[in-house]
Amino acid sequence: MHLKSIRLQNYRNYETLELDFSEQTNVLIGENAQGKTNLLESIYVLALAKSHRTTQDRELIGWEADAASIEGRIHKRTGESVQSLSFSPKGKKAKLNHLEQRRLSDYVGAFNVVLFAPEDLAIVKGSPQGRRRFLDMEIGQVSPVYLHELNQYLKTLKQRNALLKQLSTKGGDETLLEVLTDQLIELAVKIVMRRYHFIDQLEKWANPIHSGITRDLETLTIQYVSDTFQKERFSKEQMFETYRQKFDKIRENERRRGVTLFGPHRDDFELYVNNRNVQTFGSQGQQRTAALSLKLAEIELIHEEVGEYPLLLLDDVLSELDDHRQTHLLDTMGRKVQTILTTTNIDGIAHETIQQAKVFHVKQGEVETESV
């Protein structure tokens, strides 16, 4: 699949913008704070209905504007489609081929992207929250029902925490707590099982990619980390019973503290290079290679699941990679996927993928196209 064109209205520092993209490589060149990342972000938002930079949709609306919109034309094997998002103080609306979608989970997944930004290099050594977000967003692209299940889980978790807090201060009937606990467990089992499957598939692709980058000197494995389930795998029924036993065991502790003490909202995953935890023991180079391997594996995983390669977004990441890793990434781009990347300068990047790219110059929210 590829993004043929995009139209922005009052999106961040863009009042109006219409661009047509190459099916292969597109380069956005400009100094910092001119709008390159904003443009890349708008494509990510078009696909996933949320930003990777902020949780506040209001920040996406331009200065002194009341609303913002993004519209993209996407070409897939099955034909061409139009996707659009609009944002206002009242909320956001998502449309597929001009039909409004009642749930965002019905919208997400129709257009797939993989974003690689400098902060993704820190996913290996960063916080568990960042890794959970990575899991949630990527699983949501290949399994949109996951986002619905996750939203239901978080809603139930919020209700359960509020009730636990009430019980810890005022006491009361625990009948509702039992109902919410059962609902939470059912959703938790679905979420964890989908995460296990995703981790297995991601590792299947990431390991050979990592071996290729390191010239067969390193192997990469991924381990899902849960305080409920160790390395062993369980059936759906076994997982439900294990959760139930643990909730029963810590019931008084949760009531006393007024909060849910475990579940997929606290889980994590770990990366191992040659059986050593790369988060703890890996060099910066190993951590960056692991992050690059994850991103390249995402591309292959999405292709396997949906039958088409996603769009690759690179936000000023080439300058963060050494020549060897840079070449490996550019080789992947040139062979398989439409790519849109940002940079302040392409001088010194001799790779044919860049030399043959469609180039856009970005300055103060204005974009000019250059032929190469």
UniProtKB/Swiss-Prot annotation:
Pfam family, one: SMC_N
Lineage top rank: taxon: Bacteria
Biological process, per Gene Ontology: DNA replication; DNA synthesis involved in DNA repair; double-strand break repair; SOS response
Localization: Cytoplasm
Gene3D superfamilies xref list: P-loop containing nucleotide triphosphate hydrolases, RecF/RecN/SMC, N-terminal domain
InterPro entries: DNA-binding_RecF, DNA-binding_RecF_CS, P-loop_NTPase, RecF/RecN/SMC_N, RecF_2
One term under GO cellular component: cytoplasm
Gene Ontology MF annotations: ATP binding; single-stranded DNA binding
SUPFAM superfamilies per UniProt: P-loop containing nucleoside triphosphate hydrolases
Key words, A-Z: ATP-binding, Cytoplasm, DNA damage, DNA repair, DNA replication, DNA-binding, Nucleotide-binding, SOS response
Residue numbers binding ATP: G30, E31, N32, A33, Q34, G35, K36, T37
Function: The RecF protein is involved in DNA metabolism; it is required for DNA replication and normal SOS inducibility. RecF binds preferentially to single-stranded, linear DNA. It also seems to bind ATP.
Family of the protein in this entry: Belongs to the RecF family.
Protein name: DNA replication and repair protein RecF
Protein encoded by which gene: recF
